[in-house]
């Protein structure tokens, strides 16, 4: 019988070829019947075919003869009724159906006989020994019985009874090894050990042997406990008894409770009597087994030669302390080879542990018959030392335990250690994950509420930003990851989802979430440290924040410029950013040390230097020498583009010129401004000057040349005839010129900080890409000529001030305008000379 027959039959029945074959067969049968009917009809008399049933042939003949009145002899026959004809046809069809059904049954029976029976069922393997109860283990062993050729006679049974009585009277009996006895005596010794329940056997039983076996169940069970004393007993004993495994079932089945109780008593006797057994070197059941077992099964032993040399004894290594020799005994093998069915075997009751010990001993002896059988007949010499060592080991264990635990197997302690190792790695379940999720949610929520309340306090904005970041990230974590994890826990508990979610999956997901939890907790810890330090944010943190803000401003200013050499610009910006950051750090430290110095707001304390492909923003420190007039509120610009557009339109379309002050008013104010600029220039820290010298190696020479430029400014301005021919508007709006002059410095600095688009169009030396259509005006052409002569001045602060001044100022004459412009230009050159660098634009490119 095999599954292939069933599969082929299944395919044969549903195959298209089989269906076609059946249809063709039916057609051939129907054609054959039709041919026969036609043949009968043509012959006009009914010849009965053997293949057609008798009833059908008779009806066909009658139908043919009645339907055709060709024969004169049959003309006087009465026609049959239609109802009768239909009834006969139905009977005929029924008969045909029954015959076909019976044929089908016979055919199926023949096919089944050829094919065999296909059995479907559940495979139930034998339960492991540590899960079997005592009764199941006892009942399962008779199935393993193998018939033995040894026949028990009445004399042998009597010898067995006498031997068991002697074993009951004395626990240990010394037997001297002597010459080998006759074959009958060997067989009788063999039968003495066959009766013991732990040694399975199924011998041919006579009536007297059965009665003897029933009379001594208690004595048999008492001898069981002495069997696993030494390794030699364990190795030699199973050898002759491998093929017989069914005997102990009958003995223990009769009185199992008594057998267990006897084993408890004998176990205590074993521990106390091993010293006497080893002192005589001939314990009961050890040398007798060694004498008799090899001689009984010599034929079987010859077929299984050991790979070890003769008289070789298997011993553990010298360094082993945990197992040593004890695993070779059945009791130690119980714990080593088969796990205990309880997690805490030392806390169980004595009766349960003893029952388990008996079952495990039986199973382990069955196992040992297969593994240690090879060398059982080769260990007669070193038996004494082995037994002595084992006796000492067992006695030491017995002293360490209490009186109530004497019945427990000695080597169940390793099983307890293994169980403890398993307990050390608990398997998390759904309740565990729900509890930890709830606890983490409550903890993080409390953190969020605590820091939300601190946002209402008067703390720096930087600290508030950090608090908002930590709280927001925590709430996002609880909203997203915690909700997702809660859904996975529900899927695991209620078995939902496309794929099954296991506790291992939950454990892995929670490990990932725990990293994010640690991150937000680290942020809260940093906030606590920040609060303890008085909300003083670290310099690195401030530096990073300022750098980010500054980069945003630069990007917004350059967005309208055509992009060329982006890689070079980015590299130059990065290098300059490092230098500027170091400079800011030094200045910030000096500001903290000099508390008496008045500090200008952040909007004013920067000088922006734009060289076309990079931009330098330097802080400015103003001391008490600065006049009060320069500290007035600055006139803020709306947007740089709007100012630029307004100025260019006012110059080109309306013809409004740049207004300057009168000579009387301009002189004192310019002198005062120059004094302010000199003070500012001299008050710059040495560290900043050294850094700027590193940026521009030729800076000292350029500063000296600024004085030459100051002397030639008037001549250059006079030569610009285009600027002198500008029309003037009379009757303009009269403003306070002195106020505008006082606000000049702050307006220049602030306008340059806001955006570089104005500077890009009005600097004296700029790259070609910054020249826009607004430079077509006559005023800016004049400024271009000035830039050709002032090659070393990179920043035109004069035109910056002109753009910031009101275009509607009243003026007396063009000479006053020219003189004021020259004075302002000279003043700003002396003011900004420390920021001169080279420009890639050549004078001939204008």
From Swiss-Prot:
This protein's UniProt keywords: Cell cycle, Coiled coil, Cytoplasm, Cytoskeleton, Isopeptide bond, Nucleus, Phosphoprotein, Ubl conjugation
Residues recorded as bearing Phosphoserine in the entry: 67, 202, 618, 627, 629, 634, 642, 662, 725, 757, 774, 777, 806, 812, 830, 839
InterPro entries: SAPAP (IPR005026)
Chain residue ranges for the region called Disordered: 153-284, 628-674
GO molecular function, one term: microtubule binding
Biased composition (Basic and acidic residues): 156-174, 182-194, 250-266
Keyword Ubl conjugation in annotation: yes
Tissue specificity comment: Abundantly expressed in fetal liver. Expressed at lower levels in bone marrow, testis, colon, and placenta.
Cross-link Glycyl lysine isopeptide (Lys-Gly) (interchain with G-Cter in SUMO2), sequence positions: 347
One example of a Gene Ontology biological process annotation: kinetochore assembly
Keyword presence, Nucleus: yes
PTM description: Ubiquitinated, leading to its degradation.
UniProt feature, compositional bias: Polar residues: 203-225, 269-281, 628-671
Family per record: Belongs to the SAPAP family.
Biological role stated in the UniProt entry: Potential cell cycle regulator that may play a role in carcinogenesis of cancer cells. Mitotic phosphoprotein regulated by the ubiquitin-proteasome pathway. Key regulator of adherens junction integrity and differentiation that may be involved in CDH1-mediated adhesion and signaling in epithelial cells.
Protein name according to UniProt: Disks large-associated protein 5
């Amino acid at each position: 019988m095999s599954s292939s027959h069933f599969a082929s039959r299944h395919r044969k029945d549903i195959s298209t070829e089989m269906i076609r074959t059946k249809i063709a067969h039916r057609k051939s049968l129907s054609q054959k019947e039709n041919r026969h009917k036609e043949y009968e009809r043509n012959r006009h008399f009914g010849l009965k075919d053997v293949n057609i049933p008798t009833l059908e042939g008779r009806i066909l003949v009658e139908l043919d003869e009645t339907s055709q009145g060709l024969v004169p002899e049959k003309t006087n026959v009465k026609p049959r009724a239609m109802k009768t004809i239909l009834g006969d046809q139905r009977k005929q069809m029924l008969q045909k159906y029954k015959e076909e059904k019976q044929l089908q049954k016979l055919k199926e029976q023949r096919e089944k006989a050829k094919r065999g029976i296909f059995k479907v069922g559940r495979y139930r393997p034998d339960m492991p020994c540590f899960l079997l109860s005592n009764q199941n283990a006892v009942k399962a062993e008779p199935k393993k019985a193998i018939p033995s050729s040894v026949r028990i006679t009445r004399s042998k049974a009597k010898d067995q009874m006498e031997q068991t009585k002697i074993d009951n009277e004395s626990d240990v009996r010394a037997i001297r090894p002597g010459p080998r006895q006759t074959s009958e005596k060997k067989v009788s010794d063999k039968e003495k050990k066959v009766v013991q329940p732990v040694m399975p056997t199924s011998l041919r039983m006579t009536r007297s042997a059965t009665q003897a076996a029933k009379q001594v169940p208690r004595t048999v069970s008492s001898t069981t406990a002495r069997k696993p004393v030494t390794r030699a007993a364990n190795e030699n004993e199973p050898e002759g008894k491998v093929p017989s495994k069914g005997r102990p079932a009958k003995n223990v089945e009769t009185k199992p409770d008594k057998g267990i109780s006897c084993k408890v008593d004998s176990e205590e006797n074993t521990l106390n009597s091993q010293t006497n057994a080893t002192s005589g070197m001939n314990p009961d059941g050890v040398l007798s087994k060694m004498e008799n077992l090899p001689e009984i099964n010599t034929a079987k032993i010859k077929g299984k030669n050991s790979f070890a040399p003769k008289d070789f004894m298997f011993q553990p290594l010298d360094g082993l302390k945990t197992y040593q020799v004890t695993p070779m005994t059945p009791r130690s093998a119980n714990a080593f080879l088969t796990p205990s069915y309880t997690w805490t075997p030392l806390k169980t009751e004595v009766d349960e542990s003893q029952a388990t010990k008996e079952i495990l001993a039986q199973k382990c002896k069955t196992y040992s018959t297969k593994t240690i059988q090879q060398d059982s007949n080769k260990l007669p010499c070193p038996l004494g030392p082995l037994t002595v060592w084992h006796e000492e080991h067992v006695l030491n264990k017995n002293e360490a335990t209490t009186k109530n635990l004497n019945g427990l197997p000695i080597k169940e302690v390793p099983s307890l250690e293994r169980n403890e190792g398993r307990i050390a790695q608990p398997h998390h379940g759904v309740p565990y994950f729900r509890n930890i999720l709830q606890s983490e949610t409550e903890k993080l929520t409390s953190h969020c509420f605590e820091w939300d309340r601190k946002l209402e306090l008067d703390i720096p904005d930087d600290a508030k930003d950090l608090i908002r970041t930590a709280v927001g990230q925590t709430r996002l974590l609880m909203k997203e990851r915690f909700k997702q994890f809660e859904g996975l826990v529900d899927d695991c508990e209620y078995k939902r989802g496309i794929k099954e979610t296991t506790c291992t999956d939950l454990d892995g997901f929670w490990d990932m979430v725990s990293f994010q939890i640690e991150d937000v907790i680290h942020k809260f810890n940093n906030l606590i440290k920040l609060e303890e330090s008085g909300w003083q944010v670290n310099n690195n943190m401030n530096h990073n924040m300022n750098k980010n803000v500054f980069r945003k401003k630069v990007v917004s200013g350059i967005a309208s410029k055509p992009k060329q050499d982006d890689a070079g610009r980015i590299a130059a910006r990065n290098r300059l950013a490092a230098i500027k950051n170091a400079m800011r750090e030094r200045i910030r430290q000096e500001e903290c040390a000099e508390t008496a110095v008045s500090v200008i707001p952040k909007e004013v304390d920067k000088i922006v230097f734009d060289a076309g492909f990079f931009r330098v923003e330097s802080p400015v420190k103003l001391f008490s020498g600065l006049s009060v007039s320069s500290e007035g509120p600055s006139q803020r610009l709306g947007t740089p583009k709007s100012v630029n557009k307004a100025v260019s339109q006012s110059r080109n379309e309306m013809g409004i010129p740049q207004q300057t002050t009168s000579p009387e008013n301009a002189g004192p104010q310019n002198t005062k401004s120059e004094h302010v600029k000199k003070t500012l220039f001299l008050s710059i820290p040495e560290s900043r000057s050294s850094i700027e010298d590193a940026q521009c190696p030729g800076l000292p020479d350029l500063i000296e040349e600024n004085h030459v430029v100051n002397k030639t400014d008037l001549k250059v301005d006079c030569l610009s005839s285009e600027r002198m021919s500008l029309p003037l508007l009379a009757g303009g709006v009269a403003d306070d010129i002195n106020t505008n002059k006082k606000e000049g410095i702050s307006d220049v600095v602030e306008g340059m900080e806001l955006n570089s688009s104005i500077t890009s169009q009005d600097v004296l030396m700029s790259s070609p890409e910054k020249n826009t259509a607004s430079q077509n005006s006559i005023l800016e052409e004049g400024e271009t000529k000035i830039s050709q002569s002032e090659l070393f001045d990179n920043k035109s602060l004069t035109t910056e001030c002109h753009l910031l001044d009101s275009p509607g100022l009243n003026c007396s004459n063009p000479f006053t305008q020219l003189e004021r412009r020259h004075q302002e230009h000279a003043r700003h050159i002396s003011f900004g000379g420390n920021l001169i660098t080279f420009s890639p634009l050549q004078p001939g490119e204008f």
